[in-house]
Amino acid sequence: HYPAGDFLDRSGKVVGTHSGAVRYTLGQRKGLGLALGAPVYVCGKDMQANTVTVGPESELFDRIVYAEDVNWIAIPALTEPLRVTARTRYHQAEQQATVYPAENGFRLEFDQPQRAPTPGQAAVLYQGDVVLGGGTITRVEK
């Protein structure tokens, strides 16, 4: 049993209550139990505050992903920007992007915004059929 908490809209206004933030996944629409007049999706969670932020599907899209705990496979290290394809979800088609070295990992900038890249999930980088490496997503930006 998890402690109940608040559903918030993007402005921070309470729009409902939930049965524990841990039960919800970024991008989730079903099972929220909210009737707000338009479909809403889980756009963020604050585990410390036990809040779940909801909003329109457009809020789920981000272009920039930061990753740490990187494991390079086909290259010894990333020393300069590199054009790659990348995935942030298991069944996702590879997406065009540029990867940049960053402190403790890499910054990945997709050519097109991606739906719900999620901290804690993997970002895997490819060049053709070769897996360059990957890391754990730590944060995302528009």
Where are these regions (language model features)?
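AMP-forming adenylation/ATP pyrophosphatase catalytic core
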Residues: 1-142
